[in-house]
From Swiss-Prot:
Transmembrane segments: none annotated. It catalyses: L-seryl-[protein] + ATP = O-phospho-L-seryl-[protein] + ADP + H(+); L-threonyl-[protein] + ATP = O-phospho-L-threonyl-[protein] + ADP + H(+). Residues 401-686 form the Protein kinase domain. GO terms for cellular component: cleavage furrow; cytoplasm; midbody; nucleus. Interacts with LATS1, and this interaction inhibits phosphorylation of tsr/cofilin. Residues 1-24, 552-587, 759-811, 881-900, 1010-1037, 1085-1182, 1212-1257 are annotated as: Disordered. Its main location: cytoplasm. Protein kinase which regulates actin filament dynamics. Phosphorylates and inactivates the actin binding/depolymerizing factor tsr/cofilin, thereby stabilizing the actin cytoskeleton. Modulation of actin cytoskeleton dynamics may be essential for imaginal disk morphogenesis and axon guidance. InterPro entries: Actin_reg-Ser/Thr_kinase (IPR050940), Kinase-like_dom_sf (IPR011009), PDZ (IPR001478), PDZ_sf (IPR036034), Prot_kinase_dom (IPR000719), Protein_kinase_ATP_BS (IPR017441), Ser-Thr/Tyr_kinase_cat_dom (IPR001245), Znf_LIM (IPR001781). This is LIM domain kinase 1.
Length: 1257
């Protein structure tokens, strides 16, 4: 803190007059000095200084740095005393209250500065705003005007004052004076020999206030009194400011005129009692100062100008203090030393103090505190004397600057040209007119960045201005305008050497920025300013960002800034894998900011980026300078991937441009950020090119070769292709052929023209993650980028050349080192048994990719284990290589330490990856439980629509049952965290196939109508048997009722038939049986179906009964044999053995079902066609359901049309059918044995719907 000292000048009064808190000497104990801890003995020639509530010897009250006596000004910080020069030179502009360095707005009280939030009243705690009255007492206690007035009214004994002769305490106050009182104000100025002018208040002004006080007492009485202290003015007070304007360099006439011309309330900043007399000063200075009206002394006096020839009258009880103090105390302690010996000792004392250059600031505690606040300070104090400490940034007030013309206006603020009122310096004021939080944050960030920079090609920061409760920035003034105006001004002639120098200056400034770990992120031609000498500076750091990870120093870097291509082991880690590049160690996912015309592709796509985005912006600026064209894609040719169209740009704008300059622009605009050079390298290239062009020399081929081959050197020293790059094999033309040829072995030369198989290209070890753990979909997954690179490689391989094949081989070798273990993947195969199986996959690109929006919640086992032999090969070979490397190259201690650090870094990264994988596994485990239950429910309860196609499946299986074809290979689909089951197409629908309707009343009218099917269906009863007829290919037909067919078995085993008329055929059993009876019908095997189709007897029954006539409309259509049943099912038996017959029928049906199942199993083993229905996708189920609905609708329409056309014929046929005795069927037998078996079968009960049908008729 800063305080004002108080000195004892009362001579021989000894211990009287001590400050508050110290008290007089009592009880025989003398007080101790706060510095040397010596006794303060009462002596008339030994003054005692009282300050900060403590006492010092006058000789001990010195600056801790320069050892100068402190007379009227002193500063205290952390228990050490400083003079004003040393304090400001060491700590800069520090806040009076919190002792922190001020970097923003500032509140000034005299020469003491505060943060706005620290400028508050000590008594009430209220904040003191600009223009409000205040008082700074003892340079340490700040009061508002109201609290200071109350404190002044207190009794004198209640005031905590450090005083010597009853003088008031030192104070700096801001007072307000009414306009009517200004005519009585008189000022007087005195200039001493040191050139420090002062302006003080004369007694006329105070006499006026005394008169005003007396008049107020007479008019208003005793309760109302105007005290002079309340106005905060005293005789001899020093005026510091008038209405906020400093008066240090103003004359008395100017100040008097300013006071008289005031139309409002007059505000004065005054300093009360600023000077006290020090006994240690020379008498000549005192006499000269007393001759003037006021006394002004230098703020500090050096030790050489102070007379210290007197003897000290105290001894140091302890060993505290510096060596000089101990020597002085030991010399002055003895009073019996002769005068000659005393003079010799005093000379030695002075020499000892002169050689003591190490100050007390070098203790460990002080160093730690100082370096925490100022990290740029050096550890050794002796080196600080050799450094040139630059002048700290200034803090301006509104009255210091004169606003001039407006230079420009942007989205966040305005820019004005201002002139300093005193020095006449021309500067630029950037005002912020937006009050939102984002604008304030960006503005403060720009100020924080600029104040740390100091370079000739970077905009110079001068200071800040706090006006109207807003922060404004003051920078240097650049008269040339921005670079864009110079480029597009046709009146300006820009030769090629001048253009190269423009680019060189920008590269130099950006190289300095990147060395300070700052990314500009908004580099364009509008943010680069041109001086009058055509030099360029980089400006506008509102979007700049500090990089967290510092760049690692490169051990094998050439002066040009790139690695040596000969050292191929530099980028290898101890484990034999490629390290990550330095740029990718710094790469993070920052905000997308800047101008899109100059924005880098990785920033445009929202990927991770680093300082290389500034290199791409610089490349676009080089294209602007070369072609003097705007960066708008309408004028500058660009590609769809935001890169530069180099071929078109060269044809349009590079006719006369030097080739190295064009190459530099192209390499800066590379799509891969790792292939762009740093600004240090660019500055070296452009400097060499500028020197050659200035001397009218042709640029050497070596420079052009370095620029063209830079990418190979950079790739060999850092890393392979960046994962953020979208480049494929067609963009590898930049690789150097010499480096590739040097690594080709004889075995590889034999395989020169071999095409790389897809499974030979190693992939990323990460599974394609399209979703984050929180469920958000990623913008650009690794799987999509890998697929895109693979497709580009497939297209490129169609037209391979030896050149590209050699590059592919180099790429393969580099990728093999990066990803030696390939990528893990799974295949899902749904076989006939409906078992989910996973197969090992080493290459996922040969299979079709799936939609990334599928559910990723299914968990599966890890079955990607390599065979034992292959694993042995993969493990043994690296072991041999490691043994060879260890035997040939013995690493040194330094290399082993470097490898150890790399391993520790790798271990840390692996731990981070493991924690991420654990979170992903936990999330997938939770989702797996839900998906597992849903999958089980799906397999247990298939959709209802699947049951509708059960008969369709059996009919299709029966149709293809006779064809013995080999089983097709299992169909597999690629998955990546998502199972896809092998889907098989359903049985091919037969043309003209018609499915039966469910039983309903509207279908009863057409229940007797014939239905046509392309394939015969199995019969539903044991009582029916078929025999071979003359026309086996024609389907059986229902005959008219007048036709009776009787079947008899002769002695030769042949079947004889007798046809009679007046016989009717009942409808098919599948037409009138209920749904529950249909499901119990047996399913015959394919062999039985072939037998029944070969032995088919139409138009007859085995009882010799006549069949029911068929309507004329459908008489020509074929009816399958399954629609004709035995006559035992045509009518309900009336005998009491009805229940027994039904049970016999059920048992027979069960026997046939078992036999059919056995035949079906044998047939399934022999046949290659499975009869099990595959799991259909929802899309196929929907299509089959729609087809079923259409077929039902068509059947309803045909049934309605048939019923309307037949009319009464159907009713007559029904009446005739009801009069029969009910034992009619169409009988057929192929052999005598089958005929005998048919005789033993009993008839099924007649359908119950016949009586209801007859009733309706």
């Amino acid at each position: 803190m800063h305080h004002q000292q108080r000195l004892r000048a009362n001579g021989g009064r000894g211990g009287t007059g001590l400050g508050a808190g110290s008290g007089p000497v009592s009880g025989g104990h003398s007080p101790l000095c706060a510095h040397c801890r010596g006794q303060l003995l009462p002596h008339p020639e030994e003054p005692i200084v009282m300050a900060l509530g403590q006492q010092w010897h006058c000789d001990c009250f010195r600056c801790s740095v320069c050892e100068g006596h402190l007379h009227n000004w002193y500063f205290e910080r952390e228990g050490l005393l400083y003079c004003r020069e040393d304090y400001y030179g060491r700590f800069g502009d520090a806040c009076q209250q919190c002792m922190a360095v001020i970097t923003g707005p500032v509140m000034v009280a005299g020469e003491h500065k505060f943060h706005p939030e620290c400028f508050c009243c000590t008594a009430c705690g209220s904040f003191i705003g600009e223009g409000e009255s205040y008082a700074l007492v003892e340079r340490s206690k700040l009061y508002c005007g109201q609290c200071y007035g109350k404190r002044s009214c207190q009794p004198a004994d209640a005031k905590a004052r450090i005083t010597t002769a009853g003088k008031p305490m030192h104070s700096i106050r801001l007072v307000e004076i009414p306009k009517d009182a200004t005519p009585g104000l008189r000022v007087d100025g005195v200039a001493l020999d040191d050139g420090c002018p002062t302006v003080r208040i004369t007694d006329l002004f105070c006499n006026f206030f005394l008169w005003l006080t007396s008049m107020a007492e007479q008019c208003c009485g005793a309760p109302y009194r105007i005290d002079v202290n309340l106005t905060n003015l005293h005789i001899g007070d020093r005026i510091l400011e008038v209405n906020g304007t400093p008066v240090s360099d103003s004359s008395v006439e100017q100040i008097d005129k300013l006071i008289r011309s005031n139309e409002k309330m007059l505000q004065l900043t005054v300093e009360h009692d600023p000077v006290q007399v020090c006994r240690s000063c020379s008498q000549a200075d005192i006499q000269r100062a007393m001759s003037a009206s006021t006394l002004i002394l230098p703020l500090s006096t050096s030790a050489s100008s102070v007379e210290v020839g007197r003897e000290r009258l105290y001894k140091t009880p302890g060993e505290q203090g510096t060596k000089a103090r101990k020597l002085r105390q030991a010399t002055n302690a003895s009073t019996t030393i002769p005068p000659a010996a005393g003079a010799t000792a005093m000379t030695q004392l002075k020499e000892k103090e002169r050689c003591s250059s190490l100050s007390k600031l070098l203790d460990e505690q002080h160093q730690a505190q100082q370096h925490s606040a100022h990290p740029q300070l050096y550890d050794l104090s002796r080196t600080q004397s050799c450094r040139v400490v630059q002048k700290p940034q200034r803090i301006f007030r509104a009255t210091d600057l004169v606003i001039g013309e407006k230079l420009g206006e942007g989205f966040f603020g305005k820019v004005f040209k201002v002139t300093h009122r005193q020095s006449g310096e021309v500067m630029v004021l950037k005002e912020l007119h937006r009050a939102d939080e984002e604008a304030q944050r960006n503005f403060i960030k720009e100020v924080a960045v600029l104040r740390l920079l100091d370079h000739r090609h970077v905009l110079k920061f001068i200071g800040v201005l706090y006006k109207d409760k807003k922060l404004h920035m003051v920078t240097e003034y650049v008269a040339g305008g921005c670079l864009k105006e110079l480029i597009h001004d046709p009146a300006q002639v820009l030769p090629w050497p001048q253009r190269v120098r423009l680019a060189r200056d920008i590269a130099c400034g950006m190289s300095y920025l990147h060395s300070m770990n700052i990314i500009h992120r908004d580099l364009n031609s509008m943010n680069c300013l041109v001086r009058e000498d055509r030099s360029v500076i980089v400006a506008d750091f509102g979007l700049a960002r500090s990089v967290d990870a510092p760049r690692l120093p490169s051990g094998n870097m050439t002066p040009g800034g790139y690695g040596s291509g000969a050292n191929s082991d530099a980028p290898m880690s101890p484990s034999g894998t490629l390290r990550r590049s330095k740029s990718r160690q710094r790469r993070q996912r920052y905000t997308v900011v800047g101008n899109p015309y100059w924005m880098a592709p990785e920033m445009m796509k929202g990927l991770k980026y680093d300082e290389k985005v500034d290199v791409f912006s610089f490349g676009i600026m080089l294209c602007e300078i070369i072609g003097r064209v705007e960066a708008d894609p309408d004028f500058m040719p660009r590609n769809s991937d935001f890169s530069l169209n180099q071929q078109e740009f060269r044809e349009k704008f590079c006719a006369q441009c030097p080739e190295p300059f064009v190459k530099v622009a192209f390499v800066c605009c590379d799509l891969n950020p790792d292939m762009r050079p740093c600004f240090e390298t660019l500055h070296v290239w452009l400097q060499r090119l500028a020197d050659d062009l200035a001397a009218d020399r042709v640029p050497p081929e070596r420079l052009l070769h370095e620029i063209e081959t830079f990418q190979e050197w950079y790739a060999s020293s850092e890393d392979a292709l960046s994962p953020t790059s979208q480049r494929s094999l067609n963009n590898l033309d930049e690789l150097v052929k010499s480096a590739v040829d040097s690594e080709i072995s004889p075995v590889e030369k034999e395989k020169e023209n071999m095409v790389i198989k897809p499974q030979d290209i190693p992939k990323s070890p990460h599974l394609g993650k399209d979703f984050s753990p929180s469920g958000e979909r990623l913008r650009d997954s690794m799987r999509a980028r890998r697929r895109q690179r693979f497709l580009g490689a497939q297209e490129e391989r169609r037209n391979l050349t030896p050149d590209t094949e050699s590059k592919e081989r180099a790429l393969k070798k580099a990728l093999k080192k990066c990803r030696p273990f390939g990528e893990r993947g799974y295949l899902v195969d749904l076989r006939a048994g409906a078992e989910l199986q996973l197969e090992d996959v080493r290459d996922l690109n040969t299979y079709s990719d799936v939609d990334s929006s599928c559910d990723t919640s299914l968990n599966y086992h890890d079955v990607n284990n390599l065979p034992a032999a292959q694993e042995d090969e993969n493990t043994v070979k690296p072991g041999k290589e490691e043994l060879l490397e260890e035997s040939t190259n013995k690493p040194s201690n330094q290399e082993s330490q470097h490898h150890r650090l790399a391993i520790d870094d790798m271990r840390t990264r692996l731990n981070q990856c493991r924690s991420k994988f654990e979170h992903l596994e936990e999330a997938s485990r939770r989702n797996f439980n839900q998906s597992q239950h849903s999958m089980k429910n799906f397999f247990k309860t298939p959709p209802v629509a699947l049951k509708m196609f059960q008969r369709l499946e059996h009919e299709a299986a029966a149709l293809n049952g006779g064809n013995n074809c080999p089983p097709p290979p299992p169909r597999t689909q690629r998955i990546n965290q998502t199972p896809i089951f092998g889907r098989k197409n359903p049985p091919v629908a037969i043309v003209g196939q018609k499915l039966q309707h469910a039983e309903s009343l509207e279908d009863l009218a057409s229940s007797g109508v014939a239905k046509q099917l392309a394939t015969p269906a199995p019969k539903r009863s044991k009582a029916t048997a078929t025999t071979k007829g003359g026309q086996s290919s024609n389907p059986p037909l229902f005959l008219p009722p007048s036709l009776n067919i009787s079947v008899a078995l002769n002695s030769n085993g042949n079947v004889t038939t007798t046809t009679n008329t007046n016989s009717s055929c009942p409808p098919s059993a599948s037409d009138w049986l209920p749904k529950k009876h249909k499901l119990t019908l047996p399913l015959p095997s394919a062999q039985q179906q072939r037998t029944s189709s070969n032995h088919r007897l139409p138009m007859c029954n085995n009882k010799g009964k006549t069949l029911k006539p068929l309507p004329s409309r459908t008489g020509s259509q074929g009816i399958p044999a399954s629609n004709c049943v035995s006559p035992t099912r045509s009518s309900r038996p009336g005998s009491p053995t009805k229940h027994l017959a039904q049970r016999h029928t059920a048992a027979t049906a069960q026997r046939l079902t078992n036999a059919a199942a056995t035949h079906q199993q044998q047939h399934q083993q022999q046949s290659s066609k499975t009869t099990r229905l595959n799991i259909l996708s929802p899309e196929k189920v929907h299509r089959l359901g729609a087809r079923l609905t259409d077929q039902k609708q068509k059947m309803r329409e045909e049934a309605a049309a048939t019923a309307s056309s037949v009319g009464g014929a159907g009713c007559a046929a029904g009446t005739a059918a009801g009069s029969l005795n009910g034992h009619r069927t169409i009988g057929s037998s192929g052999t005598p044995n089958s005929a005998v078996g048919e005789r033993r079968r009993r008839a099924a009960p007649s359908p119950p719907v016949r009586t209801h049908f007859n009733t309706r008729c």
